């Protein structure tokens, strides 16, 4: 028997993969994780198709996703004012109680004005709608200044702040809106699959902190596992 003072033997990648292959996961459990992800992220059409293929019933009425889907489409198209109006119609108090979310939506509208090269409208909007929040929050002020800095460049997409004009920026705002709406409705706002991935990263970090050598998953999207280092 190994004492606590002894160092455990290093495990190779092949040995690790063999152990993983011996772990059995029920297909139904995997399907429930997939359905949970689709519902939480608002992918109604995919959830309906997956229900037919897997026989797994969603935890909510899929028709309840319709309003969130409309909001997502608006945000991802850059129609921020329309999205704000729909959010206010759906949950009138949400943006009043979540001022940081409201700021991010307003900031995104400013970004869309800059994208369209509507400089005067962008400056006026920043002064009338965002300046007060910038005075109240240093973090908001920093983000507003970073956004307005786009105006200093002939090609803002190629500037040091060009990431604000990427599609990922709209996606980031939508994710924040989606989580806020689900939280407001007292519904699960983070997919169980995301929680499991976070648990995996936490466990690997704990092993790293203890200087344990083990086959590490280095790419979550591909499931890439590298040899111990």
UniProtKB/Swiss-Prot annotation:
Disruption phenotype: Morpholino knockdown produces morphants which exhibit loss or reduction of dorsal embryonic structures and Wnt signaling deficiency.
Gene Ontology cellular component terms for the protein in this record: cytoplasm; nucleus
LisH domain segment(s): 26-58
Record flagged with keyword Lipid biosynthesis: no
Key words, A-Z: Cytoplasm, Developmental protein, Nucleus, Wnt signaling pathway
Compartmental location: Cytoplasm; Nucleus
Pfam families, per the entry: CTLH, LisH
Matches recorded under PROSITE patterns: CTLH (PS50897), LISH (PS50896)
Keyword Transcription regulation: no
Domain CTLH, chain residue ranges per copy: 64-121
GO biological process: determination of dorsal identity; positive regulation of canonical Wnt signaling pathway; proteasome-mediated ubiquitin-dependent protein catabolic process; Wnt signaling pathway
InterPro entries listed in its UniProt record: CRA_dom, CTLH/CRA, CTLH_C, LisH, Ubq-SigPath_Reg
Summary of subunit composition and partner proteins: Identified in the CTLH complex that contains at least MAEA, RMND5A (or alternatively its paralog RMND5B), GID8, WDR26, and RANBP9 and/or RANBP10. Interacts with CTNNB1.
PANTHER family found in the cross-reference section: RAN BINDING PROTEIN 9-RELATED (PTHR12864)
Function: Core component of the CTLH E3 ubiquitin-protein ligase complex that selectively accepts ubiquitin from UBE2H and mediates ubiquitination and subsequent proteasomal degradation of target proteins. Acts as a positive regulator of Wnt signaling pathway by promoting beta-catenin (CTNNB1) nuclear accumulation. Required for normal Wnt signaling and normal dorsoventral patterning during embryogenesis.
Descriptive protein name: Glucose-induced degradation protein 8-B homolog
Organism: Danio rerio
Protein's gene: gid8b
């Amino acid at each position: 028997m190994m004492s606590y003072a002894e160092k455990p033997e290093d495990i190779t990648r092949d040995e690790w993969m063999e152990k993983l292959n011996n772990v059995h996961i029920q297909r139904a459990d995997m399907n429930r994780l997939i359905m949970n992800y689709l519902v939480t992220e608002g992918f109604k059409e995919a959830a309906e198709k997956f229900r037919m293929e897997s026989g797994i019933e969603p935890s909510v009425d899929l028709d309840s996703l319709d309003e969130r889907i409309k909001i997502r489409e608006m945000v991802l198209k850059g129609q921020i004012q329309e999205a704000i109006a729909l959010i206010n119609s759906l949950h009138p108090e949400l943006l009043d109680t979540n001022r940081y979310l409201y700021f991010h939506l307003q900031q995104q509208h400013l970004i869309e004005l800059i994208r369209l090269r509507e400089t005067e409208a962008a400056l006026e909007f920043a002064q009338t709608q965002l300046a007060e929040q910038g005075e109240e929050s240093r973090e908001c002020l920093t983000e507003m200044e970073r956004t307005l800095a786009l105006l200093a460049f002939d090609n803002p997409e190629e500037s040091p702040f060009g990431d604000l004009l990427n599609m990922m920026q709209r996606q980031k705002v939508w994710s924040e809106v989606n989580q806020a709406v689900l939280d407001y409705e007292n519904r699960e706002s983070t997919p169980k699959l995301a929680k499991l991935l976070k648990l995996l990263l936490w466990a690997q970090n704990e092993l790293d902190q203890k200087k344990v050598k083990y086959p590490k998953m280095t790419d979550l999207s591909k499931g890439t596992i590298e040899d111990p280092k």
